[in-house]
Amino acid sequence: MAKEASGKVTLQHVATKAGVGSATVDRVLNERGNVSDSVRKRVIEAARELGLRRILPSAYRRTVRINFILSRTERPLLKRMATEVGRLSQRCEEGLYIQRTLLDREDPESVAKAMLRGAYDAVAICAPDHAFVHQAIDTLARRDCPVVTLISDVPGSARLAYAGTDHVKAGRSAAFFLARMAPRLDGLGKVIVLCHDEGFQAHAERIRGFAEQLEADDLGLKLAEIVRGGDDPLLSEIKLKETLRRHPETVGIYNAGGANRGVIAAIAANLLPRRPLFLGHELTNFTWHCLRDGRMTLAIDQSPELQAQYALEVVMHHYGFEGAVRALPPYVSDVPIVLYGPQNLPDVPPD
């Protein structure tokens, strides 16, 4: 239906665009109730798109409940994110409720069960790329409960958005610097990669980017072995020591996961002719001190605080909150990776 000659947007224009009657539009705009949330959202979005000149109500009258599900928050990265979610819950705007669910386990079945537990309007989750998780996301999508993935994506699922960083670029960056900084033994050198396992898309993408960049640079470094330590510091230390004994030509270690303490302990065992370079992830209290005193060469931080904030903005925009200005469809995350070395550390270490 065309607009009136004056160009004024009428309730009938909004009704036509939203696919409802003008009486329904009137009930929504004047907040008279008796309209479902989905129809209310459709009407508000149509009015916004058409530029209806009046103060519009919120797309949702009831409180929108968001569940952030985080596993094994004893790890520094997840601890930082859990802390930020706690901060967000204290200062979120009216009409939002943030629940923080902390899990002791991160196996796919436990995570998937947690996702389906309770009644929420949105779920934000850090989860492995596994069939159980895909099924849980798809089930929530059918319930009109959008899912935002954090830190590690679950590609090919029905999730609404990914709020993390580009892990391929992170892996490429690690390889770029390591290939140019590492010493060579007779012109050659080996590098070892440590990760949780490739079940987490973040680690798989980092390793892929790292390997591709090493091959593209062709500067005499060879990826000798990938060690899977489950992000457990002690297990990672033990496995790394075994690996270093097999590869005395190792000149660099790239930790694509979170067990930085295990790497430092393995290097401290002095199993190599010379100390290897160590590139890892996340700026924590521990890595801050390791970077400052030279035990760690570089750290690539993925800004978990910004990821939590972006995930919240995605949900807010999806439900029609006016305050969501960063997150717009198709919801491409702009969270950056930040490279830290000894010369650009914050003056004070993180908590």
Stretches with model-predicted labels:
Residues 1-58:
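N-terminal helix-turn-helix DNA-binding module of bacterial transcription factors
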Residues 46, 198, 214, 303-351:
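Hinge/cleft segment of the Venus flytrap/periplasmic-binding protein
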Residues 54-110:
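Amphipathic helical "hinge" segments at domain boundaries
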Residues 76-91, 170-174, 201-220, 262-263, ...:
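Short, solvent-exposed amphipathic alpha-helices that sit
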Residues 85, 89-112, 190-192, 214-233, ...:
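Short beta-strand elements in bilobed, periplasmic/extracellular small-molecule ligand-binding domains
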Residues 122-141, 210, 227-286:
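Hydrophobic alpha-helical
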Residues 132-169, 284-292, 296:
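Flexible loop/hinge segments that line or gate small-molecule binding clefts
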Residues 163-189, 236-237, 283, 287, ...:
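Hydrophobic alpha-helical segments within soluble ligand-binding/sensing domains
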